[in-house]
């Protein structure tokens, strides 16, 4: 995992991943997330404490069986899909992410904005309520910013909406200068938003031997294929493991009373997806994934990811 804070002036790396390029990787990541001309955060005078350590020998022995690789940890992982959106993601989450993507483009092109921001979308009342917080320069024209953000929201929310922009009034200090960043703090945003249960732990900072990551991807893959093949309108997959064991302890499917086929047909379909860790890693090619892509806008709902592929079954 990584900890970033201006107050500490340091970046702490604590991962079970061996690499000789920690300094390069850290600076590359910070360059993409901080405008150095805007932020009071000096990338040229950065202290980086590399505390990479070898993985526990007991864990290594449990996960290095080529024939029947065991789970790298115990845990219960979930995957979800719905036919309510083109991305098969929950509607409010889909809206908030699309707003955030457009906001990200604006932040990168507008010298008065930095890259720290949040978007929240809630619905169910007379209006869809949208809260946007985005870091800005002291001299920004807030009326102009409100107009720009309102236009972004209107392009991504079909219903009547109410926008609350920077409800604290001012958001000048952000990023590591304003708050310590820690891998795994935002696991709900990394997944499906608050309408779907959270299972396991954080995805980032883990190689695919950790089922927190690989099984969560596999659960999404299975749920999406169940919905995409029109077996159900909504689907939640839960899969649990014990460390060192290959076979899942439990695999359950909840279609929320939207199942469109006989249960036996659903079971036959599910059986086509081997949920053992080694099989998941091979099927989704998880040792050859550029995981940097998944640090923005959730790990799910991106058509180019292997776990988003609709299989020809």
What are these regions (language model features)?
Residues 37-38, 107, 156-157, 206-210, ...:
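Flexible helix-coil linker/hinge segments at domain or subdomain boundaries
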Residues 234-313:
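Internal helix-turn-beta structural module
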Residues 1-12:
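Single conserved hydrophobic/aromatic residue that forms the stacking wall/gate
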Residues 24, 28-174, 296, 301, ...:
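Glycine-rich, mobile lid/loop segments that gate access to catalytic sites or pores
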Residues 81-101, 206-230:
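Alpha-helical support elements that line or immediately flank enzyme active sites
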Residues 140-226:
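Glycine-rich anion/phosphate-binding loop at the beta-strand->alpha-helix junction
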Residues 10-14, 129-136, 250-255:
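Short, hydrophobic beta-strand segments
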Residues 13-30, 80, 84-87, 214, ...:
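Glycine-rich and small/hydrophobic secondary-structure elements
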């Amino acid at each position: 995992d990584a900890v970033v804070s201006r107050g500490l002036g340091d970046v702490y790396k604590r991962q079970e991943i061996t690499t000789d390029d920690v300094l390069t990787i850290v600076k590359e990541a910070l360059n993409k997330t901080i405008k150095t001309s805007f932020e009071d955060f000096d990338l040229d005078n950065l202290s980086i404490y590399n505390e990479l350590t070898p993985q526990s020998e007991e864990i290594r022995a449990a996960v290095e069986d080529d024939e029947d690789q065991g789970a790298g940890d115990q845990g219960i992982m979930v995957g979800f899909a719905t036919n309510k959106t083109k991305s098969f993601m929950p509607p409010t989450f889909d809206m908030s992410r699309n707003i955030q993507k457009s906001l990200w483009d604006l932040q990168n092109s507008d010298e008065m904005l930095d890259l720290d921001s949040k978007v929240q979308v809630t619905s169910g009342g007379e209006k869809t309520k949208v809260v946007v917080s985005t870091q800005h320069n002291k001299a920004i024209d807030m009326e102009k910013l409100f107009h720009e953000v309102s236009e972004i929201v209107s392009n991504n929310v079909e219903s009547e909406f109410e926008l609350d922009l920077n409800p604290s009034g001012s958001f000048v200090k952000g990023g590591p200068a304003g708050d310590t960043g820690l891998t795994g703090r935002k696991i709900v945003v990394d997944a499906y938003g608050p309408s779907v249960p959270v299972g396991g732990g954080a995805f980032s900072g883990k190689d695919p031997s950790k089922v927190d990551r690989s099984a969560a991807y596999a659960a999404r893959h299975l749920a999406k294929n169940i919905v995409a093949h029109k077996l159900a309108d909504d689907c939640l997959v839960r899969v649990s493991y014990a460390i060192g064991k290959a076979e899942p302890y439990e695999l359950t499917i909840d279609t929320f009373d939207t199942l469109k086929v006989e249960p036996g047909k659903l079971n036959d379909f599910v059986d086509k997806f081997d949920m053992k860790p080694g099989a998941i890693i091979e099927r989704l090619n998880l040792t050859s994934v550029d995981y940097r892509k998944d640090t923005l806008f959730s790990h799910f709902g991106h058509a180019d990811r292997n776990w988003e592929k609709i299989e020809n079954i």
